[in-house]
Amino acid sequence: MSTYIIEHLEPKLWKWCIIEYKHISHMVGKQNLWITNLKKGSKELQKYGKVIKMSVVQVPLSKVCVLDPDAHKMLTPADAKKFDYFIFGGILGNDPPQKRTGPELTSLFTYPIETRNIGSKQMSTDNAVAVVQKIVNGKRFEQLPFQDGIEIDLKEGESIMFPYRYLLKDGKPLVSEELMEYLKKKKGI
């Protein structure tokens, strides 16, 4: 069974991060999720997975794959046998992308790792995990349905655009209901 590791790279633990990590936990199971690099807020996240305060680059692991959009190879179902750990940068992406995964995560490992990409478009962390889980379970990237960009209605006459790539589940973009409710209630988006 694969372990999915989210290296928290945001300056603090935002409410939307907690919602996203909870969504990931529901998808892959608490026993298969690690959240690393958390200085504060780790107690709240323990119900969703294993929480490690230090960076994943300080945890000695083998059979590691870092998901990096700049990786030269795409993740394939055959990689499921090669890797035990799939590591994701928990970063709120910018549009256009700032290419933070390499300098803030991939380049910091002192032990051997391999990198893979899941396409050239930026995804939310929960969507990236869902895509990797599908590929590890036998689907090729090319077989997965996606939608680029979504608009979420907040209230009458007000909406928010997310320019990221979303996996389609039952024909709809994979977005946590809890996140949508949070965005609708949040002031000052």
Which ranges hold each PLM region?
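S-adenosyl-L-methionine/SAH cofactor-binding core of RNA-modifying enzymes
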Residues: 29-97
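A short, charged/proline- and glycine-enriched loop
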Residues: 1-3, 62-63
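Structured adenosyl-cofactor binding patch, chiefly the S-adenosyl-L-methionine
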Residues: 103-152
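C-terminal accessory extensions appended to soluble enzyme cores
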Residues: 49, 55, 133, 137-189
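Short, surface-exposed basic-aromatic patches at helix termini and helix-loop junctions that form
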Residues: 23-26, 79-81, 103-112
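Histidine-anchored nucleotide/phosphate-binding helix
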Residues: 13-28
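Short, glycine-rich nucleotide/cofactor-binding loops
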Residues: 4-16
